């Protein structure tokens, strides 16, 4: 396999992973939408900063790498902000 073929194969795999990531993010968003409705039905606040912090630290602890601890934190802070924007 020459260099161009290797690049194309790697790029194709990255595209597959990107699609899988978006599928999972959309599934997560739907679950959070359901969770939000349960919270609304029970007069609970949508955002729970203590729960968010705990969840982020759990994901940091579970991360096998190579993504750094700071990278995991940044990813989840961004993901949670996105979900809040999407769901209001």
Residue ranges and their predicted role:
Residues 1-88:
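Domain-level signature for soluble enzymes in the chorismate/prephenate branch of the shikimate pathway
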